């Protein structure tokens, strides 16, 4: 049986979330092996106490993995698990990637590989004209420059971000807190159809899952995971957009916030983010593009191995410094060109955690610099 089948069946066990699944995978090598493990062996894994193991044993006796997969595919034909090569790389690198990620729409391989630049745009469901105007302006500008816009299709800022992106001829991803077949809010049906035709709808919840307020905070971590940077356009103090911003910061994504008057309640959340270190969204859009990293170009232009980023002329590199083997391996994967983190991981051939640690050491040594959007280049 394929490993993805076991990711699916393990996801059906209450109390066993993404973090415990990663521990199982690390302990047993595969989730298939974990599925066959005895209760005593399961208890060796951190987080698997008597109650959790009892739940696992009870559920395993009720599920035939292959039959469950075939039944599940009838209503959920399109999904990825971390065992699939197509699983979005940026989400996979987060601490708690969904065990199952359902999708509908048009898949773009470069997007899944983390090559296409992605920006999350989020905010309040009840925006001001000022917030709407800036959201539409920024979303359209980024879309025209080749960025994919990520949001949650909620009323307000999310909806405006998706619409402006589509109107500009761009591509957008909508992350749901429901099943991918459940349009919420229902009056966004037309927008939903447009996104399916030009982008992608994603969710960690299976088909038919209805809206529930408790699911939306978890949804926000996927928005943050898919995005190299998150822009909070308008948010009061208790806005759900602030959860997305916090998670994005935890994921080492860059967080930006739109500023306004201090007495404007609808922007108090944005002001708090700015106080905490978020970057202010500049008035000049060209400046924002620079802050987001190398100015992207359209995929239709062929500029070699990194088609989505402007390339500079080759330069003579200084001799390699004397480094420990792993540091040297990561340093060699970085160049004078701006490269995204996941591409450096791929070039280095090491685990993401090892690369992240090495990059930090190289930064402290003054050999590498980190740019917005988890991109790096040699100093």
Predicted region positions:
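Glycine-biased, small-residue-rich flexible motifs in mid-sequence functional cores and linkers
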Residues: 1-4, 82-379
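Short, small/acidic-rich helices and loops at N termini and domain boundaries
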Residues: 1-85, 365-367, 372-379
